[in-house]
């Protein structure tokens, strides 16, 4: 155990030799990434060359799951169920902690689940069936591929029939066939009814209600043939009882542009006018009211905004009051799907809601190994083509650190009672980080943004109150800014000249980060309404507990949202403030600034970047033989008038 932690710490420091001092039964993150970038995982190869490494990765995942959950294992030895799913598929039953074990518990019987999996596996592309991977408040968050089209379905059915000696092993056991099943088997859609019927049974057994489809197509068209379908265009409306959400998201080939732009996702917008893009965004109205997002503008969002808003939607679904589960899928389920499954897992973990005992390096290992490697992401192929969706996933953590992505159900302060004395520094100090806003106005060194909830009477608009120091030129600034967070806190502190720190760069970084934040910044009003009062000093006779006198504050100016100075207030040197500024970083609530969530996600991202740079690295694009062949075939298809798209199936 200590060796694993030491290896994780070494990986987070960027050491390529992180495996040197760890016991042979465990692999560090660096070795995991090396194996991942060297070969694609296949369940049937687990006992062959490199099998010992894969076995250690699998055992490490089981050990990490076992820290917080009681689980069963569905065997997939040699890929009998699916060739690119884990050989040990983990089914989480309940949290093992004393506090939670009696709160939420799965009602699923593993034997019946296993039977439904075997029966339904051909319903989805590449046999990638609906698989539960996250347990949150008793709800199963699942992943899969999209529905198989008739070509794949009949092809696999014939293959299985031929190689099983004439017996269709998926339907060999028919002792529990109901009258409803018999009725479904009539007519020309016999096979579709059968396999999709079992797929629906599996979804219902896992209590899945919401199905989120990330495909930009209604049906995947390849060389002029429909190779996959999706629930939203099922002609028989078999999935009508589920809540279907079409949230089109660019495929892995789009992330070639992300790499070519120096890994800058800000400003990178998908071309929605391509001929194969025919799946519009479609979300039931009752699911969007609480999110305050203008979904009609989705085609104008850049990659950061789109990913942020989709993640907010998924978090709102899993955090709803009902007990309904969620399915996320794309086409093959090994690029876009693990992206959002990983972001969900890491976001909920950062809130302390799942995997509560895992450290940042441990949750990172589990996410990379289980959500990406063991579920068949083709990192080798993606790296050769420059399609770095895997790197994007973990680098993107800097954009979801703020509390607006938190699933914790805390009561927001929607309004404050009017008082004659205005706002005191204690009021600012007691505001949650979520309510402090961001540095969005030019020239501001500190801004306080009071957020309003839609429809809340008496609440504040998005109006900034900025406190700008007006002291002597010798004043220096202590700045706390985190470019990884959409919201930053900047506080000016006078210091001796020798303590002066470069400030312009930090301020620019903070503003750059703020500008990339979802569509949050679009909701700021700069109308110059009546400003709030400057925080007033408390009486010396009534200091706050833990406060101290300070003599280095000088005067402060009040600036409205439009930037005009309204009035001046002076904080006298004998004023008692609700916090003090020692030479080292204080533990006061205003400068404790980093929330647990932000700290955790930053540590995960830092550990990933260190390990990735020392193993995989940010590579130049190399030509892919398979890509060249696919390109020639695509050109041929276009030449004969067939409708087709890129050869990369996601």
UniProtKB/Swiss-Prot annotation:
Its main location: cytoplasm. Its EC number is 3.1.3.95. The modification Omega-N-methylarginine is found at residue 638. CDD domains: PH-GRAM_MTMR14. It is found in: Cytoplasm. Keywords: Acetylation, Cytoplasm, Disease variant, Glycoprotein, Hydrolase, Methylation, Phosphoprotein. SUPFAM superfamilies: (Phosphotyrosine protein) phosphatases II. GO terms for biological process: macroautophagy; phosphatidylinositol biosynthetic process. GO terms for cellular component: cytosol; perinuclear region of cytoplasm; ruffle. The modification N6-acetyllysine is found at residue 194. The active site is at residue 330. A 1,2-diacyl-sn-glycero-3-phospho-(1D-myo-inositol-3-phosphate) binds at residues 333-336, 382. The modification Phosphoserine is found at residues 518, 530, 580, 624. It catalyses: a 1,2-diacyl-sn-glycero-3-phospho-(1D-myo-inositol-3,5-bisphosphate) + H2O = a 1,2-diacyl-sn-glycero-3-phospho-(1D-myo-inositol-5-phosphate) + phosphate; a 1,2-diacyl-sn-glycero-3-phospho-(1D-myo-inositol-3-phosphate) + H2O = a 1,2-diacyl-sn-glycero-3-phospho-(1D-myo-inositol) + phosphate. Residues 1-27, 476-546 are annotated as: Disordered. Expressed in various tissues, including heart, skeletal muscle, placenta, liver, lung, kidney and pancreas. GO terms for molecular function: phosphatidylinositol-3,5-bisphosphate 3-phosphatase activity; phosphatidylinositol-3-phosphate phosphatase activity; protein serine/threonine phosphatase activity. Glycans are attached at residues 226, 519. A 1,2-diacyl-sn-glycero-3-phospho-(1D-myo-inositol-3,5-bisphosphate) binds at residues 333-336, 382. It is linked to Myopathy, centronuclear, 1: A congenital muscle disorder characterized by progressive muscular weakness and wasting involving mainly limb girdle, trunk, and neck muscles. It may also affect distal muscles. Weakness may be present during childhood or adolescence or may not become evident until the third decade of life. Ptosis is a frequent clinical feature. Belongs to the protein-tyrosine phosphatase family. Non-receptor class myotubularin subfamily. This is Phosphatidylinositol-3,5-bisphosphate 3-phosphatase MTMR14. It comes from Homo sapiens (Human).
